[in-house]
Design a protein with these regions (language model features):
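Acidic-leaning, charged glycine-interspersed low-complexity segments
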Residues: 94-149
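Extracellular/virion structural assembly segments
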Residues: 78-98
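Short, charged, surface-exposed interaction patches
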Residues: 39-67, 111-130
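Small/polar-rich, solvent-exposed N-terminal microdomains that initiate assembly or binding
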Residues: 1-62, 147-149
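Residue-level signal for secondary-structure boundary sites
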Residues: 56, 83-85, 142-146
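Oligomerization/assembly interface segments of phage tail-like spikes and tubes
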Residues: 66-83, 129-141
Length: 149
């Protein structure tokens, strides 16, 4: 089974209209660009990040660790204008939703998506650019096969 950040990255890179909208600049902190290189990515761009996981028992009476992890990955959209950020964010949401539906139709194993959150639109004076982040959360079972290729 693919990790959440890989699913998001693959979904975004598979869509030709989104790739065209950002000039092919869809990168991942896990595969291509480190956090220090994010400031040097030309605009507009999309940066996919693996934001880690959390394992928490349902109650204090449970074991200290359960088989389920809550995994988080994000899509950061950077652009020159707020309007462009919003347009690309909407495209990202549509693309990811369609990609996951297609994976389910093909009976591919995917993590159980729990929620989607969005940050507020913000200004980064150091880059400089406007940006917004979509954060996807899912539940995975640590007993499932998560080996990397």
């Amino acid at each position: 089974m693919k990790d959440l950040d890989e699913i998001l990255y693959d979904a975004l890179r598979a869509d030709e209209s989104l790739m065209e909208a950002v000039g092919g600049r869809i990168v991942s902190t896990c595969f291509e660009v480190g956090p220090d290189g994010q400031d040097n990515t030309p605009l507009p761009c999309i940066i996919v990040t693996d934001d880690g996981w959390q394992n928490q028992p349902a109650s204090k009476d449970d074991d200290w660790e359960t088989d389920e992890d809550r995994v988080t990955a994000s899509i950061e959209v950077d652009a020159d204008s707020p309007k462009e950020v919003k347009r690309i964010v909407r495209m990202c949401r549509r693309v990811v939703s369609a990609y996951i539906a297609q994976m389910m139709d093909n009976d591919e194993e995917i993590p159980e998506l729990d929620s989607l959150q969005s940050s507020q639109l913000a200004w980064d004076w150091m880059k400089p650019c406007y940006w917004q982040t979509l954060t996807y959360n899912c539940t995975t079972n640590i007993t499932d096969d998560h080996e990397q290729d």
